[in-house]
Structure formats: C-alpha cells, structure tokens
Amino acid sequence: MDLDGDYLLPGLVELHTDNFERHLMPRPKVHWAEMPALLGHDAEIAAAGITTVFDALGVGEADTDSLRGAPWDRVLEAMDTAGARDLLRAEHHLHVRCELPAPNTIDLFTPFHGHPRLSLISLMDHTPGQRQWENLAQARIYYTGKKGWSHEKFERQVAHSATLQAQYAQPHRAYFVDYCRTHGIALASHDDTTAAHVAQAHAEGAALSEFPTTLAAARAAHERGLLTVMGGPNVVRGGSHSGNVAAAELARAGLLDILSSDYVPGSLLSAVMQLVQDQVLALHQAVATVTCNPARAAGMPDRGELAPGLRADLVQVHMAELPDGNRQAVVRGVWREGRRVL
C-alpha cells in the first residue's frame, strides 16, 4: 500500500463520545429519528478515523423532554437493526453514563440490562458545588449562559440538586457498582476532584478516571492504577471549558493515558497532533492515547496497534500545510477489519 508520504495509524478507539446524543437531539427539544441519527453519527465517527466507538448515552434527568430523562428503547432497537444489517462503518459499543442524584436513573437503565453492546458504565454527579462544578461561580456562568437560566433559577436548582443528591446518590452508586461487578462490565469514575474520590472509585473496582478535574486527582488515579481519560477538545482549546485542569498539563506530568473526543469527534486526531507540535509528547506517545491505551483499557487486545495477527483497523492521515504555517490532520482513508469504510 503506497500512501504517498501520509501516516498509517491504527484505527482510533473512542471510549467516550456524546456525539450520538447530539445527532438524536440536534437542537433543544428537537428529537431526530433514531436510524438517520445513528447513521449520521456513525459517518462522522468514521470520518474522524475512529473504528471502535463507545457511544456515551446518559441516563438520569428530571426533565423528561431531554434525552437523558427519556427511555432509550428505540435507540437500542436502531443500533441492533443497523448492526444486523451491516449498516455501520465503525464498531459500536455502549457506554452508559449514570447520573447518580437523579431519581429515575435506575428505571431508565432498564433497557440496557444484558445488552450485548454494553461495555462500560460511568458514575456521574453533576450537582453544582461537586466535582466538575466544585467552583460554583463557573457553574453559574455555564448554566446561565448555555442553559439560559436566570440567577434566581440557578439558586433554586442548586438547593434542589443538593436535596436529590442526599437522597439518591449513594444508593444509586451502590446499585451500579454491584451491577458492574456481577455482570463483568468495566466501571469508570467521572470528574474526580480529590484523592478521596479516587480512593472510593478504586475501592469500587473502577478501571478509569474520566476527566479528573485536578492534578492531585490525576496523580492519585495513577498511584492506584486507574487510567486517566481527558478530552481532546481540552487539548485543542488549550484548557477545560469549565475551568478545570488542562489535559496538556497532565500529559507533561506523565499523567495522561487516554484521550476522548468528548463532544467533537475530529478533536482526537487534532489533539494528538497538537500535543506533538507543542512538544508535549512524542508522536508514538500521543498516538497511543487514542489507540492501544483505550483498546487495552476496554479489554480489546486485538486492536490498537499495527502488528501481525491484530485486526486490520487502519487510518490514512495526511498532514496538510495551511497558509498560516500550521498543519492540519486530514483523514484520507479508513479500514475496519480490512474493509475500506471511508
């Protein structure tokens, strides 16, 4: 295979992307049909060089008009149909994100019970004043800006969220930890802020610390053997949108294991090349964060590397020279299990 000077990389492995949810609800309160949403998401994933994707679907939300407050049955049916009819370019798995303080989290998880694509569960708590939103000032900016809340509504929601957390978070946490243990599902903690958060996750059997918000939490995760996951957009933008620790800072400290595209599929390759361009990581180290490291974390030793006997999941990447002197990674070809899908 002559790639005319382009890079040949292993197919990217994505453990956490919210992109499917964006296709299912492209605007607030606008619900898109499940099959075209799935196929549009799948095409975008493949175009980003991702050959194995864990679609992150959230369960638990007071607002029943939101995706995370509504049943997922029809979405799972679409995934089953598309898989059975060979309509998908990438290999899709399920990553269920469980909002622990929400009253309906366990009920909304029911359709996922025993689903063959279920491979990862993460435990979330987005209560203002906790974890990602430990800084209430940052939380206020986010909710009044993106959500359009008034300051009065924000104050009411903070109080209401604290009440729900006190009632539901711990019993829901115990339920999902037990589910993962008894069903052999990988467990991830989310937005760890302190060493105590990491210690709890480790005791519960978590393998991943998703988006640790502080250097101390990331260091504690490594000390206890948890792999850290940070967002590609964090690298590309030069920092966290919610004011937390920068992914590049963790990489410099040797504390970055895995990159996730989070909410922008194309950010995986862009982040890899950004880390290399900024001399934060060598090329092979940066590529490992989106290939062999997530593959091993997911228990998939058959992919993530270019080696005899492994799956022929491949990505051809061209580095285009731009007028401003920068270089842009461009996906020119994608193969999954030896078959060209893009």
Where are these regions (language model features)?
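Metal-associated gating/positioning segment near the N- to mid-region
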Residues: 3-75
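Hydrophobic faces of well-ordered beta-strands that scaffold small-molecule active sites
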Residues: 11-15, 53-55, 90-96, 119-125, ...
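Metal-coordinating catalytic core of metallo-dependent amide/deamination hydrolases
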Residues: 60-192, 262
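Active-site glycine- and acidic-residue-rich loops that bind
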Residues: 96-107, 192-196, 200, 208-210, ...
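Glycine-enriched alpha-helix->loop->beta-strand junction motifs that scaffold or abut catalytic
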Residues: 115-119, 201-208, 223-229, 253-257
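A general structural motif
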Residues: 167-169, 189-191, 209-218, 237-244
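His/Asp/Glu-enriched, well-ordered alpha-helical/loop segment
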Residues: 182, 224-234, 238-317
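C-terminal cap of metal-dependent C-N hydrolases
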Residues: 292, 308-342
